[in-house]
């Protein structure tokens, strides 16, 4: 019954708000005194009765007119703002929604500055604004006005924004979609706006969660991007980063992919789950992509530790096809790659992403050849930085470092066919991208993919997986061939242009290579006749059945033409072909464009025209016949009715459009040009130019003619450029770009001139296009010289024109030309004052347009446009910078030096002020300026003098404003444009790309031979490969037999371990030794047996020829210096049964650099703990069962330790004699290929004995940390600086229970295991468990190891044989043989992978590319301008900022701790979250029934004081009514005083209130009380029974409680507040609503209480309530009369007006 009653009552309440009254026309006499007008308006608005709503509406609208007329002036208005607001707020209480809307509008016009807003908020009008937003009564007009008012409040002063309105907006944002609220998007937009202006109030109220929740709700990329960008903006700056919970909030957008059981809403029906999941995938994908498009997003998702990027890549390793499919789409989008079609056929998928595939925009009716060429032909810029390359390189490096390539290998070999195909193409694309844009240290190991190769070659893995791997390798080979070939033109028109350009440049015929195949034929008449017969042309007239391949061969036959062969058969052959091709025959011309043979027929047609040309006089007649027929067809096509003629002639759909190619072919030959002139073809085409509606014919004309010779073709082009329609002029202008990129001969002589003419076209689009093409053309110095020679006017073209003019300064000729006119000095001043800053806007706008949905406003329109259309791999070529152009020559450099420009810029970089956005922009401007200066050798010298590059590097790694780091990455790329710049960055552990764009993929240097010679001359490291490979290298290790790892040495008994260590100690003298003593530890286990012979050979191969062995009898091996003791060590192990913490007393390096030396004995050390923050592992941290060694590894033998220690060096040098077989590093381990150190640390928290899986990693990266080891190092702890990737299923296995304590040491194991690639075991049962276990561990413990391992078959042999196999099993006895078997698959190209590498030749230089010297490419300014830190994690480190709420917890005695304070202290910002102490008093209050039932009831028990009003938080400041009493000094009537003042209660005995003596026990009728106390107090009664309670009368004894006594009013107030507070919880909501409805029904006057309503509004503003609950509560109070507030307004209006001041001023 209660539920039914509730529904009826709410319905009735809603009807009240629907008043469709229109505005009554109320005249406003603006000539009257403004104060009189205002008084009249306010009196009408404030009257409770006697004024219709329509009239009130008119008066409110007059108020806005009056304000607009006289402005904001209390003197003129005659009222204080407080008085005006007290009257205006009554409009918000009106029953008509139109009046409320007008009241909100009036307030919006009134609030002009912070002082007025403060007064509005002081009078608690925000409660009423929130009420307008909350109540849903189809009152969109009112709510729209409320939201507009809210936005005005944000604009005026966001820092004053009230939490009451914020909570209301957030409630709509959270629950609006379920409620079908049409204002939900508007509210979310306002929350975003507010978050940028006042993030604290949004974060405090849980608004950031609302924004992120809506990211997953929204499938519109523009909105989705705006939402996530709001969060990213907060993460960008250290001051606002505190409002976003680290590692929690941003990662929510990953949940649909990383949580397999993700449900966005618990209410989703089972039938809709799949559809809902797809929607979440789409929204999440948009959010992830937008996040990776910003620096804040990249750095937060890629930061070391348990990062979002690791979660994403880790999920690839779990065999869930739906997730894998979705994630692959995300990855394609992140890297801006075209998505292949869904198919099981690799070739079909490959063709779908071929850049040369047909696109709709290439049709004749659309962009045609100009659009196709822009896609296919490369940009002219060879070394101009494309900022998209820098961005993609950074993203790619981060993904590769976190194991993406290995994750893809797992997807390829263990997924459905269509997913496997997509993953293969993605892998190919990423490898291609890595080779093109990644520096050596990030890419030198990518071309091997040992894991995939080993899978394809090893027979130890399942056949299906092996076949998949093999197929993938074949597919990658096909992909490689496609990339090597480059994009081929689709249309014959573009192919024709390119081939002719190549032919003229190389001075040879385009078909020369094809003809080589024909030379083998006997050049005899007999052979020709046989071919004529076989071609079928002479046999029958079925044209399409002729042998067109043979026809083409005959036409290209050397020395065969009509002049040389007079045979009649050849003439018949020609006549038949001529008849077929003539338009009048309607044979060729009527064939469909989509015909399979269409291209071949056209190519043969072009060859036919060339054949007739070569035949000279004999063929002239035939050719003239053909050309005249084409002219006749042309005249007919360009008839009076173009639409009809196009339709009839089928120009758009048939091969007739290819007749223009015949004309184009003729225009390439001098004789052909004469023929075209003779037949009036040029005249016909010239006539076309001026015709309207012939766009298609003009496009074909422009695209077909040859312009390499001066003649009529250029005249036609020039006429089309100037006289044709807008569309044709634009197309012809775009075609000039085609000619530029195709490298048409002498373009600088005539093309530049045509482009300069187009700059003055009246159509801005055309002039802008011409300007863009000129900008590209000026990449070529010849074109730039030609442009300077023409001295064009560019100033009318805005910023782009200015930037093109600045290009003149890069060469002395242009500099002199502009300097003579005083232009240079003016520009230097202009750039110094404003343009350096404007340059930042220019670049960031281009980047935004390329990376986001943002689109540049058109023609000065300020409206920011967004587009859902996805751009195909856009380019952002760096705009020209004044300083960057000047430094190309000595004069310009001198100019910059004289003006001290660089000194000032360096000062800005060294002392940045990051508090204001203006200062951040100033810093960016300085960085861009310095980067441009450093892009030439001249300028670089200036930067070196100032020594500013280290400061830029420091900003790139440590700047707390994350977007500055991004700018630094771009800027350092500019410095890497020259060889000198690359070398400087190399010294600071930044690696650069050392090639230009003119080198096609794959990048192969000219001096490969020299490289090979250098490689072969270097002594080898330990080579883990077959004898044949070793011998090819002439290395010292060639004498090692293939069984070198079958080491057997039983000196230490059967339970000892054979473990390889590689310990490089920089300051120690290199030596090899065996350690006695600790080696005998029983807790160790072996990898394989050993023999002294082989062992010695290994030692020999590992030792430098000039150094001596240290015998095993010398335990000390020479005394180590104290320096040696303190130096950091790099350790690689194949397995570590134990951990030994370095316990040197002098060990003082920073915690981020501590290394663990893994030994069989456990030596805890407190001293190490003191040295830094990395916890040490003491004796109690790891406990091994005594039986561990003997039970598990009975069969195995001794442990050998091999140590290489490099010689002392002032820099951190890594020697080549490293024990390394990493097939992913082309034989260059991270030790021998980078100037960095590697540390291993173990997290004690990760040594949980419940974790049963080996914490291994799979990643194709090599880890390098380039921190110098100083005690002062302030880098973050290892838990942040090291990353771990997940192992794909099958690449690692679960440890047995006995081995669980090994988990932590095994983290370091990974390093060496990564370097030995063997074969997989087939124990599939551990796959899923191991992977899931690792996922859990990653979330629980940030692992502390660097992860550079690969999921290789070899690693699994090691792990499974030594750890998971049973001790006595046959499998474990075969370890050595399996080990060797695996070794045979450990390499792809053994010469590349396992060859010895000399420190001087290949350290930090690309295995293929980096040997290419600048001399190879010529010029110094030749690289693409891209640099990355050797350890990419360097730029992903962020200082932990504590979450802001921890700072706001009030002290225990504070009022805020007692209850809900005004600033919301201590409140949770989570949805529905209440801090426990916030409302504990209200929650602990006894219900009304309990109080009545108490035997010992007394007034003092439930009244807090003798003046208790029943309102816990009521004050004069937070009550709508009382605040005015305080403000006005207004004395309410006696009738009103009883509302709030209860000082008279103490005089009334309790017995009088209750009409019964205190001592009588209170009887309860349970069925009648359960409606309130049972449900409200969370009793076990169910909602259904609660709602069906028959009656909820409150009884005292048998009598009903009298509701007119003060005591009862207080109790009812308390009960209402208690129930309202309970509504903020989602538990038993229906019960609490029923309780409130019952009180409403029995005691309706309870809710007619302004103070109670204010208290409830106060609750609503400081607690989180669901939208449904807010609406329910607001509707309960819709009957409040607010009479007292009307009385206050009347009292205000009764005060005489303030007019003396106005009169005096008027008189004076």
Curated annotation (Swiss-Prot):
Pfam families: RasGEF_N_2 (PF14663), RICTOR_M (PF14666), RICTOR_N (PF14664), RICTOR_phospho (PF14665), RICTOR_V (PF14668). The modification N6-acetyllysine is found at residues 1092, 1095, 1116, 1119, 1125. Residues 1147-1158 have a biased composition (Polar residues). Residues 1021-1045, 1101-1198, 1218-1247 are annotated as: Disordered. Disruption phenotype: Mice develop normally until 9.5 dpc, and then display growth arrest and embryonic lethality by 11.5 dpc. SUPFAM superfamilies: ARM repeat (SSF48371). It is found in: Cell membrane; Endoplasmic reticulum membrane; Lysosome membrane. The modification Phosphoserine is found at residues 21, 35, 265, 1138, 1161, 1218, 1234, 1273, 1277, 1281, 1283, 1301, 1312, 1345, 1352, 1384, 1387, 1395, 1410, 1570, 1573, 1576, 1591. Residues 1021-1043, 1221-1239 have a biased composition (Low complexity). There is a cross-link at residue 274 (Glycyl lysine isopeptide (Lys-Gly) (interchain with G-Cter in ubiquitin)). The modification Phosphothreonine is found at residues 1103, 1135, 1270, 1294, 1331, 1375. GO terms for cellular component: endoplasmic reticulum; endoplasmic reticulum membrane; lysosomal membrane; lysosome; plasma membrane; serine/threonine protein kinase complex; TORC2 complex. The modification Phosphotyrosine is found at residue 1385. Residues 1-789 are annotated as: Interaction with NBN. Residues 521-570 are annotated as: Ribosome-binding domain. Highest levels in liver and brain with expression also detected in heart, muscle, spleen and kidney (at protein level). One of its GO terms (biological process) is positive regulation of cell migration. Phosphorylated by MTOR; when part of mTORC2. Phosphorylated at Thr-1135 by RPS6KB1 downstream of the mTORC1 complex: phosphorylation of RICTOR inhibits mTORC2 signaling by creating a binding site for 14-3-3 proteins. Phosphorylated at Ser-1234 by GSK3B in response to endoplasmic stress, inhibiting mTORC2 signaling. Ubiquitinated by the SCF(FBXW7) complex, leading to its degradation by the proteasome. Deubiquitinated by USP9X; deubiquitination stabilizes RICTOR and enhances its binding to MTOR, thus promoting mTORC2 complex assembly. ATP binds at residues 543, 572, 576. Keywords: Acetylation, ATP-binding, Cell membrane, Developmental protein, Endoplasmic reticulum, Isopeptide bond, Lysosome, Membrane, Metal-binding, Nucleotide-binding, Phosphoprotein, Ubl conjugation, Zinc. GO terms for molecular function: ATP binding; enzyme-substrate adaptor activity; protein kinase binding; protein serine/threonine kinase activator activity; ribosome binding; zinc ion binding. Belongs to the RICTOR family. Component of the mechanistic target of rapamycin complex 2 (mTORC2), consisting in two heterotretramers composed of MTOR, MLST8, RICTOR and MAPKAP1/SIN1. The mTORC2 core complex associates with PRR5/PROTOR1 and/or PRR5L/PROTOR2. Contrary to mTORC1, mTORC2 does not bind to and is not sensitive to FKBP12-rapamycin. Binds directly to MTOR and PRR5 within the TORC2 complex; interaction with MTOR is enhanced by deubiquitination of RICTOR by USP9X. Interaction with MAPKAP1 is not enhanced by RICTOR deubiquitination by USP9X. Interacts with CCDC28B. Interacts with NBN. Interacts with SIK3. Component of the mechanistic target of rapamycin complex 2 (mTORC2), which transduces signals from growth factors to pathways involved in proliferation, cytoskeletal organization, lipogenesis and anabolic output. In response to growth factors, mTORC2 phosphorylates and activates AGC protein kinase family members, including AKT (AKT1, AKT2 and AKT3), PKC (PRKCA, PRKCB and PRKCE) and SGK1. In contrast to mTORC1, mTORC2 is nutrient-insensitive. Within the mTORC2 complex, RICTOR probably acts as a molecular adapter. RICTOR is responsible for the FKBP12-rapamycin-insensitivity of mTORC2. This is Rapamycin-insensitive companion of mTOR. It comes from Mus musculus (Mouse). The gene is Rictor.
